[in-house]
From Swiss-Prot:
Keywords: Capsid protein, Coiled coil, Helical capsid protein, Host cytoplasm, Host-virus interaction, Phosphoprotein, Ribonucleoprotein, RNA-binding, Viral budding, Viral budding via the host ESCRT complexes, Viral nucleoprotein, Viral release from host cell, Virion. Belongs to the filoviruses nucleoprotein family. The gene is NP. This is Nucleoprotein. Encapsidates the genome, protecting it from nucleases. The encapsidated genomic RNA is termed the nucleocapsid and serves as template for transcription and replication. During replication, encapsidation by NP is coupled to RNA synthesis and all replicative products are resistant to nucleases. GO terms for molecular function: RNA binding. It comes from Lake Victoria marburgvirus (strain Popp-67). One of its GO terms (cellular component) is ribonucleoprotein complex. This protein can be divided into a hydrophobic N-terminal half, and a hydrophilic and highly acidic C-terminal half.
Amino acid sequence: MDLHSLLELGTKPTAPHVRNKKVILFDTNHQVSICNQIIDAINSGIDLGDLLEGGLLTLCVEHYYNSDKDKFNTSPIAKYLRDAGYEFDVVKNADATRFLDVIPNEPHYSPLILALKTLESTESQRGRIGLFLSFCSLFLPKLVVGDRASIEKALRQVTVHQEQGIVTYPNHWLTTGHMKVIFGILRSSFILKFVLIHQGVNLVTGHDAYDSIISNSVGQTRFSGLLIVKTVLEFILQKTDSGVTLHPLVRTSKVKNEVASFKQALSNLARHGEYAPFARVLNLSGINNLEHGLYPQLSAIALGVATAHGSTLAGVNVGEQYQQLREAAHDAEIKLQRRHEHQEIQAIAEDDEERKILEQFHLQKTEITHSQTLAVLSQKREKLARLAAEIENNIVEDQGFKQSQNQVSQSFLNDPTPVEVTVQARPINRPTALPPPVDNKIEHESTEDSSSSSSFVDLNDPFALLNEDEDTLDDSVMIPSTTSREFQGIPAPPRQSQDLNNSQGKQEDESTNPIKKQFLRYQELPPVQEDDESEYTTDSQESIDQPGSDNEQGVDLPPPPLYAQEKRQDPIQHPAVSSQDPFGSIGDVNGDILEPIRSPSSPSAPQEDTRAREAYELSPDFTNYEDNQQNWPQRVVTKKGRTFLYPNDLLQTNPPESLITALVEEYQNPVSAKELQADWPDMSFDERRHVAMNL
């Protein structure tokens, strides 16, 4: 016995066994009516139990063989199913006009019979059977990925077919609940998948619109979940006139061993014949020997080479430890391509001028293809970042994470480019009632979330691009504070009351500022909310660009009640240094305010990593309106006798000269006035106030 054959033991069946399964077929003189009632039962969410496979096969036999049982029994479909262990039991009832009449009279079918008695069916069209089967076929291409990806793919195909005028499906079929039911049926029913795939490949005549859709869906299902097979056969095992040659990047000994094992697994897969490209969908034997993890180096190299050739499907994750190998294979393949093209041009060019023209063209072609591929991959990476952020928010929401009653998530703004600010001093008239709630605020957000979810990529999608390194998601979600300042509007001190026109301001801001487009995809992510969250909840990004909202609204309106609110992760959120109201009474400040935040040489180094995760804690006297009734602006005297106009001086982009002079003199590590001016916009309003009050 070859000792190395121990490694192969258990990978091949030595005593093949097929589990027998009985399938009930229904045969009546009113077959179309029976089939329509089966469709109605499925659409209504009724669980047919072990009659489901038989009901689906009855639909297929009616559609493809016009319920001719003899033709079906002699067909390749019936032969394959019998070899797979299926036995057909035909229930005949010539006079039956209802599905109820053909169900066997057995005790365990009594709940099904009761459910079917309440079902009313008025449809009796034969074309509805083909419509239902074509609708089921739309779920095949992404069936192995997951329900979300499969449903989104089906919806895209429905849109295409409707635009082309091929077929229109009933609206209630396109609801999420119904599509999940169909997905579950297709995922569990081997017979339905097999018949659709078989007929989609082999039906060559008698096509109607429904058969055309089925054939199109089956064509898109080929090699679904078998990306490694497709990439290795196309790019690694290169087929030439002289035979099959290995790609130069896999000619080392260790990778050669993986190639040999992979070829053995491919030979086992090829025994399935025309069904081999659908092995993952049909869950055929030997499919578990074709996982990426069994051939890590071969898989990484194959995907890198495929990406270099313009394949945008080669973004599947091959393991963190092999990501660098994939990138190296990508770079090496690009260099090899250029070298081969150069050699070909030298051979076919007749003179130097033609050679230069050809070299320039091929160089441009390679660059264009490479840039287009990277653009598509970047787009997939962005979609994944949005999906990951949404999933993280959903996890927090599901865990019921809530803040304490004395904490509210707030976002204190950075100052943007220089803007002239005028603050009108006038008496404050406190309203006795809370501001009116924003109409349909919560409903509007949920509508946006559901409408934008179609662009997400499922995390389990083998064709979705996963992040190439651990920092990808963090880098894409976190926006530096210098960028966030560019698309902020009129500077305003942080206020505790909420903006009443946030949705209108958001639309104006998005339409007038192009720099903000790159940040929009993060704003569309759903907020983490609980059922009892305040209607006044908004985030600072939506309320920064309102006309006339710089200081007046924050003074006029009382703070909202301290409802329990969720911690919102906002890329421009800053940590509080103080717990006092910026428009409240200015008292003594405890603590060393001038202590550098991040480094001893930088007085106000921006906390880009921690600011997005810290919430502000309100002072106990925050809700006391009497403490806040003051006229603004006013001249304030600091602890050391310096004066400045509050809050006007703190709203300017550049700090007052008195503050700059004091900071330069009093800091332990001397810094220049230029550095301080550069750091001033990165301070939150509270940080500026505390610095000013301690000078």
